[in-house]
Amino acid sequence: MKSPLPWLKRRLSGRADSEHAQNLIRIIITTLFISYLGWRYQHTHGDTLMATWLILVGELLVSLGLMVAILLRPQVSHTRRLIGMLLDYTCTGAIMAIQGEPASPLYAVCMWVTIGNGLRYGSNYLRAATAMGSLCFLGAILISPYWKANPYLSWGLLLGLIAVPLYFDSLLRAMTRAVREARHANQAKSRFLANMSHEFRTPLNGLSGMTEVLATTRLDAEQKECLNTIQASARSLLSLVEEVLDISAIEAGKIRIDRRDFSLREMIGSVNLILQPQARGRRLEYGTQVADDVPDLLKGDTAHLRQVLLNLVGNAVKFTEHGHVLLRVTRVSGSAEDAVRLRFDVEDTGIGVPMDMRPRLFEAFEQADVGLSRRYEGTGLGTTIAKGLVEAMGGSIGFKENQPSGSVFWFELPMAIGEPLKSSTVRVPTGALVDAPEELESSNIIAFSNPFLRHRARVRSMRMLVADDHEANRMVLQRLLEKAGHKVLCVNGAEQVLDAMAEEDYDAVIVDLHMPGMNGLDMLKQLRVMQASGMRYTPVVVLSADVTPEAIRACEQAGARAFLAKPVVAAKLLDTLADLAVSTRQLATPATTVQVATSFEGVLDSSVLDELAALGMGEEFERQFVRQCLDDAQNCVGDIERDGTCSDWEQLRESAHALRGVASNLGLAQVASSGGELMRMADWQLQAEWRLRLSTLREQLKAGKDALDARVQGVKDGECSPRSNE
C-alpha cells in the first residue's frame, strides 16, 4: 500500500496561496492547547473545563473539515478564509472569557492570527482580522471576571491588538509598494533587453543570410577562411543574443517545460560532440562518468537539460587552462522505483571562484572581476540561465570548491523513468545519393552537399511573395529563394502584400511580423477574411526577430503556417518551403506537364520529376533518384505498421511526416495526401483507422510505383523527357 503523503504534497504544492499552511498550523495549535489545558487541570473537574474541551474539539473538527475542503477544491476560496478567521477568533474569545487567567496566553494567538492573515492575504484581510480580533477580545473583557478585575491590563492589551496590526499594515503597504516598483523596474529592464536583442537580429539576418549564399559559390582557400571567420563571429553574436532572450524569459516566468522520453547517455554524447573539440584545442583532459545505477531511459525536458550542461561544462572548459574537465552523473539515494533524482557534477581544475564572488555567482551579468570579463568573452549569464532552468524543472543547483584548485558546479533534478525507446530505422535522406567531391562539380551529377541544389532537386519552383520593411532583409530572402529555384516578388509592407495577392496567385508568402503601418498579424487576419470570401488559400510564413512565446502564439492563432526566427537559417527556410510545396502542389497545373498515361492521372504529378529532368542531371541520375525514394517510401510504410502495432501514435505521425516528404519528392500526390491526413489525425482516430489507412497507403504506393516505372521506361525510350520536345 502506497503512502498518501506524496499525493498530499502534489495536491497542495501547486496552490496559489498558503491557506493550507495556515489551517495546518491551526490544527497543531488547537491540539497543543488541548494538551496544555489537560496538563493544567489534570486534577480539576468542572463545567468550565468541559465547555473549553467542547470548544477546542469543535474547532479541531471544523479545521479538519476545512483541510478536506482544501484538498477537494485547491482553488483560492475567500469563503474558506473568512470561515477560518471567524473560527479562530470566536473560539479564542470564548475560551478566554470562560477560563480567564489560565487562558491568557491565547492573547498571543489572537495577535498571531491577525498578523498571519495580513502577511498571507494582504492589507484588506489584515484590517478585517484586526476588527474581528478586537471584537472577540472585547467580548472576553466584558464577560470574564478575571479581565474585569484587571482593567488597565485588559484595555491596554485591546489597544495593542488594534495599534500593532494597523502599524504593521502601514509597513506592509510600503513593502508591497516597494516590491511592485522593483518588479516594474525589472520588467522594464527585461523589455529593454528583449528589444535590444530584437534589434540585433535585424542586421544579423543580413550578415548570416548573405554568408550562407556566399558559401555556395566558388571560393579559394583564403576566401573560405575569411568566410568561416565571419560565420563563426555571427554565430557567437547570435548566441549572446539568445542568452539575453533566455534570461528575459526566465525572469518573466515564461519557461515552458516539455517532458519527453529520452536516452540520457545519448544526450550527454551530443554535448560531448560540441565541447570535446574545444577541450582538445585547449589541451585539456575531458571526460564523462555515468554511474551504473543511473537509468538510461528517462522522461524529462531534454532540451533544457542539454542547455544547462552546455552552459556549465562550457564554462568549465572556458575557465580552465590546465588539467581536466569532468562531468559526473550519479543517482541520489532514496529514489522511488518509478522516478529518480539525479545529481550532475561538473568538475574542473580551472581558476575557481573568488570568495567575494560566490554570493553573487548565480546573479545575472556577473563574472569574477573586470579583468576576467575582458579576458573571457561572454555575457555572464550562463550560470544564471542554468539556475533558472534547473529550478523551473524542479531541481536545485549549487557550487563547491574543488581542492586544490578549480570548482565543482552541481545540480540535482527529479525525473521519471522513461518508456523503452524503439530502435528506429536510420533513413538516408533522398538528397544524399552522392557525396560529390569538388572535382565533380562541373559534371552532370548534383553535388548534394549544396543545400540549394538539393532543394531544387526535391521541390518544384514556386512563386513567392516576400514582405519586409528592411531592404537588406528583402535582398537576403530574394537571393536565398532564387538560389533555391523559386520566383520571388519583394514588397516593403503588408498593404502591398494584400494588393499583390488580389492581382495574382502565389504559392507562399513570407512576411515580417513588425512593419510600419499594418503589421504582419493584421495582414494575416485581413488575408483570412479575404480567403473566406473566395480568394485562393495561400500559406503564410512569418519571419521575425521577435521570438517571444507570445509572438509565436499570436501568429499561430492568426493562421500563420510556420514561424521562423531571424537571422534566417537557410536549411530551416528550405525545409519549411519543402513542406509548403506539398500543400500547394495539387494547385499547380503547368501547361508543359507531360502526362505519362491517362490511367495514372491523379497518382503521379509528373511536373515534379520534369523539373528535376530540366536541370540536366541525366537519365541515370533520375533512375537512381526514383529507386532511392521508393526504397525510403517502403521503409516509411514499414515504420507506420510497426508504430501502429505498438500503439505509438506520436511516432506514427512522425513516420507519416517522413512518408509525405519522400512522396512529395517523387510527385506521388495520393501518397503525400494520405500521409498528411495521418499526421493530422487524433490518437483515437488512429487507433480505430490505422490498419485501413495503411492498406490504402500500400495500394497508393503500388499504383505510384507502377506510374514511376512507366515514366522511367518512357525516359529510357526518349518519350517523356522535356528535352525531347526541344
From Swiss-Prot:
The modification 4-aspartylphosphate is found at D512. It is found in: Cell inner membrane. Residues 463-581 form the Response regulatory domain. The keyword Membrane applies. Disruption phenotype: Deletion of the gene results in overproduction of DSF. At low DSF concentrations, interacts with RpfF. The N-terminal input region plays an essential role in DSF perception. DSF binds with high affinity to a 22-amino acid sensor region at the N-terminus. The response regulatory domain, but not the HPt domain, is required for repression of DSF biosynthesis. This is Sensory/regulatory protein RpfC. It comes from Xanthomonas campestris pv. campestris (strain ATCC 33913 / DSM 3586 / NCPPB 528 / LMG 568 / P 25).
